[in-house]
Amino acid sequence: MCVVIWLTHGRRTIPRRSATWACPGVLGSTLVLQDWTIGAYGSDEAGLICGYLFEAGAAQPVRAVDSSQAAEWLARTPVQERAGAERAYMWLHFNLSHAQAERWLMRHAGLSDVFYETLKDGLHSTRIERADDSLIAVINDVHFEFSFEPSDISTLWISVGPRLVVTARSQPLRSVDALRTAVKAGDAPKSSTELLEHLMRAQADVLVKIVRDGTARIDSIEDELLAGRLDHKRARLGTLRRVLVRLQRLLAPEPAALFRLLQTPPLWMSESDAQQLRAATEEFSVVLRDMGALQERIKLLQEEIAANVNEDNNRSLFVLTVVTVLALPINITAGLFGMNVGGIPLAEHKHGFWILVGIVVTFTAVAAWLAFRKKR
Protein backbone atom coordinates (compact mmCIF):
# COMPACT_ATOMS: atom_id res chain seq x y z
CA MET A 1 0.00 0.00 0.00
CA CYS A 2 1.35 3.44 -0.95
CA VAL A 3 0.33 6.74 0.60
CA VAL A 4 0.94 10.04 -1.16
CA ILE A 5 0.87 13.19 0.93
CA TRP A 6 0.25 16.43 -0.94
CA LEU A 7 1.29 19.66 0.74
CA THR A 8 -0.71 22.70 -0.24
CA HIS A 9 -0.69 26.36 0.64
CA GLY A 10 -4.08 27.97 0.28
CA ARG A 11 -5.32 26.80 -3.09
CA ARG A 12 -1.86 26.50 -4.66
CA THR A 13 0.65 23.70 -4.78
CA ILE A 14 4.14 24.62 -5.87
CA PRO A 15 6.35 21.74 -7.11
CA ARG A 16 10.05 22.09 -6.53
CA ARG A 17 11.61 18.74 -7.43
CA SER A 18 10.51 15.09 -7.59
CA ALA A 19 11.92 11.68 -6.75
CA THR A 20 10.83 8.18 -7.84
CA TRP A 21 10.27 5.45 -5.28
CA ALA A 22 9.27 1.81 -5.64
CA CYS A 23 6.14 0.70 -3.78
CA PRO A 24 6.86 -2.48 -1.87
CA GLY A 25 4.47 -5.30 -2.59
CA VAL A 26 3.15 -3.81 -5.82
CA LEU A 27 4.76 -5.26 -8.93
CA GLY A 28 6.02 -2.76 -11.44
CA SER A 29 4.55 0.17 -9.58
CA THR A 30 6.32 3.42 -8.91
CA LEU A 31 5.52 6.35 -6.70
CA VAL A 32 6.40 9.87 -7.72
CA LEU A 33 6.88 11.94 -4.59
CA GLN A 34 6.77 15.66 -5.15
CA ASP A 35 8.69 18.02 -2.89
CA TRP A 36 6.57 21.13 -2.50
CA THR A 37 7.77 24.49 -1.35
CA ILE A 38 5.23 26.42 0.68
CA GLY A 39 5.50 30.09 -0.16
CA ALA A 40 4.67 32.96 2.10
CA TYR A 41 1.24 34.44 1.78
CA GLY A 42 0.98 36.95 -1.08
CA SER A 43 4.24 35.97 -2.80
CA ASP A 44 5.48 33.20 -5.07
CA GLU A 45 8.16 30.61 -4.36
CA ALA A 46 10.91 33.23 -4.78
CA GLY A 47 9.29 35.72 -2.41
CA LEU A 48 8.19 37.97 -5.29
CA ILE A 49 4.99 39.83 -4.42
CA CYS A 50 4.60 41.56 -7.76
CA GLY A 51 6.69 42.33 -10.81
CA TYR A 52 6.17 44.56 -13.83
CA LEU A 53 8.08 45.03 -17.07
CA PHE A 54 7.83 48.54 -18.50
CA GLU A 55 8.50 48.80 -22.25
CA ALA A 56 7.72 52.25 -23.60
CA GLY A 57 7.75 51.31 -27.28
CA ALA A 58 6.05 47.92 -27.01
CA ALA A 59 2.47 47.06 -27.91
CA GLN A 60 1.87 46.32 -24.22
CA PRO A 61 3.75 49.05 -22.30
CA VAL A 62 3.22 47.41 -18.89
CA ARG A 63 3.30 43.67 -18.39
CA ALA A 64 3.10 41.68 -15.14
CA VAL A 65 5.88 39.12 -14.69
CA ASP A 66 6.60 36.32 -12.24
CA SER A 67 9.95 35.33 -10.79
CA SER A 68 10.85 32.91 -13.61
CA GLN A 69 10.02 35.48 -16.32
CA ALA A 70 11.97 38.12 -14.39
CA ALA A 71 15.01 35.83 -14.15
CA GLU A 72 14.84 35.15 -17.89
CA TRP A 73 14.63 38.86 -18.72
CA LEU A 74 17.46 39.77 -16.33
CA ALA A 75 19.67 37.09 -17.88
CA ARG A 76 19.70 39.02 -21.14
CA THR A 77 22.50 41.46 -21.75
CA PRO A 78 21.57 45.15 -22.06
CA VAL A 79 22.33 44.95 -25.80
CA GLN A 80 19.86 42.12 -26.29
CA GLU A 81 17.27 43.93 -24.21
CA ARG A 82 17.72 47.18 -26.10
CA ALA A 83 17.04 45.44 -29.38
CA GLY A 84 13.64 44.41 -28.07
CA ALA A 85 12.69 47.64 -26.31
CA GLU A 86 14.62 50.88 -26.23
CA ARG A 87 13.69 52.08 -22.74
CA ALA A 88 12.64 48.92 -20.96
CA TYR A 89 13.09 48.45 -17.23
CA MET A 90 11.63 46.13 -14.61
CA TRP A 91 10.20 46.64 -11.13
CA LEU A 92 10.28 43.71 -8.68
CA HIS A 93 8.72 43.90 -5.22
CA PHE A 94 9.85 41.26 -2.69
CA ASN A 95 8.72 40.02 0.70
CA LEU A 96 11.77 39.83 2.96
CA SER A 97 9.92 37.51 5.32
CA HIS A 98 10.24 34.82 2.65
CA ALA A 99 13.37 32.71 3.06
CA GLN A 100 14.07 32.56 -0.69
CA ALA A 101 13.75 36.29 -1.46
CA GLU A 102 17.31 37.36 -0.70
CA ARG A 103 18.75 34.23 -2.29
CA TRP A 104 16.85 34.87 -5.51
CA LEU A 105 18.09 38.46 -5.61
CA MET A 106 21.70 37.39 -5.13
CA ARG A 107 21.36 34.78 -7.84
CA HIS A 108 19.56 36.79 -10.54
CA ALA A 109 19.38 40.53 -9.79
CA GLY A 110 23.06 41.47 -9.74
CA LEU A 111 22.53 44.21 -7.15
CA SER A 112 25.28 46.13 -5.40
CA ASP A 113 26.67 44.68 -2.18
CA VAL A 114 25.69 47.94 -0.48
CA PHE A 115 22.02 46.99 -0.88
CA TYR A 116 22.46 43.75 1.08
CA GLU A 117 24.53 45.57 3.71
CA THR A 118 21.73 48.12 4.06
CA LEU A 119 19.24 45.32 4.69
CA LYS A 120 21.29 44.19 7.69
CA ASP A 121 22.77 47.39 9.14
CA GLY A 122 19.74 48.15 11.34
CA LEU A 123 19.63 51.85 10.36
CA HIS A 124 16.12 52.76 9.25
CA SER A 125 16.40 56.52 8.66
CA THR A 126 15.16 57.71 5.27
CA ARG A 127 18.05 58.23 2.88
CA ILE A 128 19.06 58.00 -0.77
CA GLU A 129 22.68 57.37 -1.63
CA ARG A 130 24.70 56.31 -4.63
CA ALA A 131 26.36 52.90 -4.72
CA ASP A 132 28.44 52.14 -7.80
CA ASP A 133 26.09 52.79 -10.74
CA SER A 134 22.84 52.45 -8.79
CA LEU A 135 20.84 54.26 -6.13
CA ILE A 136 20.14 52.73 -2.73
CA ALA A 137 17.16 54.20 -0.91
CA VAL A 138 15.58 53.51 2.47
CA ILE A 139 12.03 54.78 2.87
CA ASN A 140 9.88 54.44 5.98
CA ASP A 141 6.15 54.10 5.55
CA VAL A 142 3.09 53.16 7.59
CA HIS A 143 0.98 50.04 7.60
CA PHE A 144 -2.49 49.90 6.09
CA GLU A 145 -4.15 50.14 9.52
CA PHE A 146 -2.21 53.09 10.93
CA SER A 147 -3.52 53.96 14.41
CA PHE A 148 -0.83 56.37 15.67
CA GLU A 149 1.14 53.58 17.33
CA PRO A 150 4.95 53.44 16.99
CA SER A 151 4.73 49.81 15.87
CA ASP A 152 2.69 50.87 12.80
CA ILE A 153 5.82 52.14 11.03
CA SER A 154 7.87 49.88 8.76
CA THR A 155 10.74 50.18 6.28
CA LEU A 156 11.01 49.78 2.51
CA TRP A 157 14.44 49.09 0.96
CA ILE A 158 14.95 50.13 -2.67
CA SER A 159 17.65 49.58 -5.28
CA VAL A 160 17.33 51.68 -8.44
CA GLY A 161 19.30 51.08 -11.62
CA PRO A 162 18.73 51.92 -15.29
CA ARG A 163 17.13 48.51 -16.02
CA LEU A 164 15.94 47.24 -12.65
CA VAL A 165 14.14 48.60 -9.60
CA VAL A 166 13.94 46.29 -6.59
CA THR A 167 11.80 47.09 -3.56
CA ALA A 168 11.75 44.88 -0.48
CA ARG A 169 9.72 45.00 2.71
CA SER A 170 8.78 42.85 5.69
CA GLN A 171 5.22 44.15 6.17
CA PRO A 172 2.61 45.56 3.75
CA LEU A 173 2.98 49.30 3.16
CA ARG A 174 0.67 51.96 1.76
CA SER A 175 3.08 53.61 -0.66
CA VAL A 176 3.79 50.38 -2.54
CA ASP A 177 0.09 49.58 -2.74
CA ALA A 178 -0.58 53.07 -4.12
CA LEU A 179 2.12 52.55 -6.77
CA ARG A 180 0.69 49.15 -7.75
CA THR A 181 -2.76 50.69 -8.08
CA ALA A 182 -1.38 53.48 -10.28
CA VAL A 183 0.47 50.99 -12.50
CA LYS A 184 -2.65 48.85 -12.91
CA ALA A 185 -4.62 51.99 -13.81
CA GLY A 186 -2.17 52.78 -16.63
CA ASP A 187 -0.11 55.46 -14.85
CA ALA A 188 3.22 53.78 -15.49
CA PRO A 189 6.46 55.60 -14.56
CA LYS A 190 8.54 56.33 -17.66
CA SER A 191 11.87 55.54 -16.00
CA SER A 192 13.27 53.81 -12.97
CA THR A 193 14.05 57.15 -11.32
CA GLU A 194 10.47 58.29 -11.87
CA LEU A 195 9.29 55.14 -10.09
CA LEU A 196 11.43 56.07 -7.07
CA GLU A 197 10.05 59.60 -7.20
CA HIS A 198 6.52 58.16 -7.34
CA LEU A 199 7.21 56.15 -4.16
CA MET A 200 8.53 59.23 -2.37
CA ARG A 201 5.50 61.30 -3.36
CA ALA A 202 3.17 58.51 -2.23
CA GLN A 203 4.94 58.49 1.12
CA ALA A 204 4.63 62.28 1.33
CA ASP A 205 0.87 61.97 0.67
CA VAL A 206 0.59 59.46 3.52
CA LEU A 207 2.47 61.85 5.80
CA VAL A 208 0.12 64.68 4.84
CA LYS A 209 -2.83 62.51 5.87
CA ILE A 210 -1.11 61.63 9.16
CA VAL A 211 -0.49 65.32 9.88
CA ARG A 212 -4.11 66.11 9.00
CA ASP A 213 -5.45 63.38 11.30
CA GLY A 214 -3.07 64.43 14.06
CA THR A 215 -4.20 68.05 13.70
CA ALA A 216 -7.84 66.96 14.02
CA ARG A 217 -7.04 65.07 17.22
CA ILE A 218 -5.18 68.01 18.71
CA ASP A 219 -8.01 70.40 17.75
CA SER A 220 -10.45 68.14 19.62
CA ILE A 221 -8.24 68.12 22.72
CA GLU A 222 -7.88 71.91 22.56
CA ASP A 223 -11.67 72.32 22.38
CA GLU A 224 -12.08 70.08 25.44
CA LEU A 225 -9.42 72.07 27.27
CA LEU A 226 -11.03 75.41 26.50
CA ALA A 227 -14.48 74.09 27.46
CA GLY A 228 -13.15 72.73 30.76
CA ARG A 229 -14.12 69.15 29.92
CA LEU A 230 -10.62 67.75 29.55
CA ASP A 231 -10.08 64.59 31.59
CA HIS A 232 -6.32 65.25 31.93
CA LYS A 233 -5.42 62.06 30.08
CA ARG A 234 -2.05 63.26 28.92
CA ALA A 235 -1.18 59.75 27.73
CA ARG A 236 -3.06 60.46 24.49
CA LEU A 237 -0.88 63.46 23.75
CA GLY A 238 2.25 61.62 24.85
CA THR A 239 1.60 58.72 22.48
CA LEU A 240 0.83 61.06 19.59
CA ARG A 241 3.96 63.10 20.22
CA ARG A 242 6.16 59.98 20.41
CA VAL A 243 4.79 58.75 17.09
CA LEU A 244 5.36 62.12 15.42
CA VAL A 245 8.89 62.34 16.80
CA ARG A 246 9.69 58.85 15.54
CA LEU A 247 8.13 59.60 12.16
CA GLN A 248 10.16 62.77 11.82
CA ARG A 249 13.36 61.00 12.85
CA LEU A 250 12.79 58.11 10.45
CA LEU A 251 11.33 60.04 7.54
CA ALA A 252 13.61 63.06 7.42
CA PRO A 253 16.01 62.46 4.51
CA GLU A 254 19.70 62.85 5.22
CA PRO A 255 20.52 66.23 3.63
CA ALA A 256 24.22 65.56 3.01
CA ALA A 257 23.59 62.33 1.08
CA LEU A 258 20.81 63.94 -0.97
CA PHE A 259 22.99 66.95 -1.73
CA ARG A 260 25.81 64.76 -3.02
CA LEU A 261 23.39 62.67 -5.07
CA LEU A 262 21.68 65.63 -6.72
CA GLN A 263 25.01 67.33 -7.43
CA THR A 264 26.55 64.27 -9.10
CA PRO A 265 23.73 61.98 -10.28
CA PRO A 266 24.47 58.73 -12.14
CA LEU A 267 25.10 59.06 -15.87
CA TRP A 268 21.93 57.13 -16.75
CA MET A 269 19.73 59.58 -14.80
CA SER A 270 18.29 62.33 -17.00
CA GLU A 271 18.16 65.96 -15.93
CA SER A 272 14.36 65.91 -15.77
CA ASP A 273 14.45 62.88 -13.45
CA ALA A 274 16.93 64.65 -11.19
CA GLN A 275 14.66 67.71 -11.06
CA GLN A 276 11.65 65.55 -10.16
CA LEU A 277 13.64 63.86 -7.41
CA ARG A 278 14.65 67.26 -6.08
CA ALA A 279 11.00 68.39 -6.11
CA ALA A 280 9.93 65.24 -4.23
CA THR A 281 12.59 65.97 -1.62
CA GLU A 282 11.26 69.51 -1.20
CA GLU A 283 7.76 68.11 -0.64
CA PHE A 284 9.21 65.99 2.14
CA SER A 285 10.72 69.07 3.73
CA VAL A 286 7.38 70.90 3.73
CA VAL A 287 5.56 67.97 5.33
CA LEU A 288 8.28 67.56 7.94
CA ARG A 289 8.04 71.26 8.84
CA ASP A 290 4.30 70.83 9.35
CA MET A 291 5.02 67.82 11.52
CA GLY A 292 7.45 69.85 13.60
CA ALA A 293 4.82 72.57 14.08
CA LEU A 294 2.35 69.90 15.17
CA GLN A 295 4.83 68.68 17.78
CA GLU A 296 5.13 72.21 19.15
CA ARG A 297 1.34 72.41 19.50
CA ILE A 298 1.35 69.12 21.39
CA LYS A 299 4.13 70.39 23.66
CA LEU A 300 2.17 73.56 24.46
CA LEU A 301 -0.96 71.53 25.15
CA GLN A 302 0.96 69.23 27.48
CA GLU A 303 2.32 72.25 29.35
CA GLU A 304 -1.18 73.76 29.61
CA ILE A 305 -2.65 70.49 30.88
CA ALA A 306 0.21 70.10 33.37
CA ALA A 307 -0.44 73.65 34.61
CA ASN A 308 -4.15 72.86 35.06
CA VAL A 309 -3.33 69.66 36.93
CA ASN A 310 -0.92 71.53 39.22
CA GLU A 311 -3.54 74.19 39.86
CA ASP A 312 -6.12 71.56 40.80
CA ASN A 313 -3.62 69.86 43.08
CA ASN A 314 -2.75 73.15 44.76
CA ARG A 315 -6.43 73.90 45.28
CA SER A 316 -7.00 70.50 46.86
CA LEU A 317 -3.97 70.91 49.11
CA PHE A 318 -5.19 74.35 50.19
CA VAL A 319 -8.61 72.97 51.14
CA LEU A 320 -6.99 70.21 53.17
CA THR A 321 -4.72 72.77 54.86
CA VAL A 322 -7.66 75.02 55.77
CA VAL A 323 -9.62 72.10 57.20
CA THR A 324 -6.60 71.07 59.26
CA VAL A 325 -6.05 74.61 60.54
CA LEU A 326 -9.72 75.07 61.44
CA ALA A 327 -9.81 71.79 63.31
CA LEU A 328 -6.57 72.48 65.17
CA PRO A 329 -7.95 74.65 68.06
CA ILE A 330 -10.83 72.34 68.90
CA ASN A 331 -8.55 69.29 68.70
CA ILE A 332 -6.01 70.84 71.06
CA THR A 333 -8.67 72.02 73.49
CA ALA A 334 -10.52 68.71 73.45
CA GLY A 335 -7.26 66.88 74.00
CA LEU A 336 -6.25 69.00 76.98
CA PHE A 337 -9.63 69.13 78.72
CA GLY A 338 -10.39 65.51 77.98
CA MET A 339 -7.59 64.19 80.17
CA ASN A 340 -8.83 62.39 83.26
CA VAL A 341 -6.56 64.22 85.75
CA GLY A 342 -7.10 66.65 88.53
CA GLY A 343 -6.77 70.41 88.30
CA ILE A 344 -8.60 70.86 85.00
CA PRO A 345 -9.51 74.58 84.65
CA LEU A 346 -13.17 75.61 84.82
CA ALA A 347 -14.18 72.12 85.90
CA GLU A 348 -16.32 73.55 88.76
CA HIS A 349 -17.32 76.79 87.04
CA LYS A 350 -21.00 76.97 86.17
CA HIS A 351 -20.26 78.68 82.81
CA GLY A 352 -17.09 76.68 82.05
CA PHE A 353 -18.49 74.96 78.97
CA TRP A 354 -19.51 78.20 77.27
CA ILE A 355 -16.20 79.80 78.13
CA LEU A 356 -14.39 76.94 76.37
CA VAL A 357 -16.73 77.24 73.36
CA GLY A 358 -15.92 80.92 73.12
CA ILE A 359 -12.18 80.24 73.33
CA VAL A 360 -12.38 77.57 70.60
CA VAL A 361 -14.51 79.77 68.32
CA THR A 362 -12.15 82.71 68.79
CA PHE A 363 -9.02 80.70 67.97
CA THR A 364 -10.78 79.05 65.02
CA ALA A 365 -11.80 82.44 63.62
CA VAL A 366 -8.25 83.77 64.01
CA ALA A 367 -6.81 80.65 62.29
CA ALA A 368 -9.32 80.95 59.43
CA TRP A 369 -8.49 84.65 58.98
CA LEU A 370 -4.77 83.89 58.83
CA ALA A 371 -5.28 81.02 56.34
CA PHE A 372 -7.49 82.98 53.95
CA ARG A 373 -5.30 86.08 54.20
CA LYS A 374 -2.35 83.95 53.07
CA LYS A 375 -4.43 82.59 50.18
CA ARG A 376 -5.31 86.09 49.01
Where does each model-flagged region fall?
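Peripheral, non-transmembrane regulatory/ligand-interaction domains of membrane transport proteins
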Residues: 2-263, 269-270, 283-286, 293, ...
